[in-house]
Amino acid sequence: MADKLWVGGDGTGSQQTDWSRAANWSPSGVPVASDTVTFQSSSTYSVTAGLDQSSVSLGAMRIEAGYSGSIGTSSTPLECDPASLVVDTGDVGANLFFDFGAQTLDVTIKSCSFGSLGTYGVELSGAGVAISTLIVDSGKVGICTGVNETATVTTARVSGSAGELHLGTGVTLTNVDQSAGTIVVACSISDIDISGGVLTTDQAAAVTTSATVHGGTLNLDGSGTVASLVVHGGTVNFRGGVARTVTALTLNQGSISYDPASVTVTTWNVADRPVTVSATT
């Protein structure tokens, strides 16, 4: 177990950005199992070669403030299996692309870039990757947004106003905890707890257990069934004409906008306080 710092720049051409070149690391030597890998501002070199490191179970991977290089590409990401990933490049960082295979890890995005149109500052893919805790504070992050990419995420948390998280259809998502920022979800979710920011469900996304709204905005645009919706504040919108069902709805405070021609509410539960309900066209 050792600490490995990415330096880059050894040799010529693509050798300078090759993960597999020993002299691109300090101390010299390609990272092996359990090594901690760090990218710092002292290196401006990207990682564009030697990207298949899937056989190496790394320790922690840290992409620190000031590192402005890119890692992998959308079509050829860095394949690796770290125990954890922490990114804090700020908006100066280039795009970072990772394929974590079926690895189990925690992911913390303190800050990253917002990418160009249609891309993400950090894009994570895999085939059964298991993310226990996913935290996004700032920057644009995509999780398995491509075709045939799959992941399980136990808890996804966005707490920074500049955080933006997108989850693809191949994600199995248990808990969402949002107090700020933006989340767009194309997969089904077990539990949502939102107190700020904007969360939008898309495509066939369902809420299989409950959505609890304390504040912020919840746009339930997905066609899947919402098992339970409890509104203590904030705004809930059912946008578009897609048919969907809410099995149980409780409105204690806040507002709900929906069209009964497309949204079926099976049971309106009794609120826990006096409420005023108004309808507009």
Short names for language-model regions:
Residues 1-281:
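Extracellular beta-sheet-rich ligand-binding/adhesion modules
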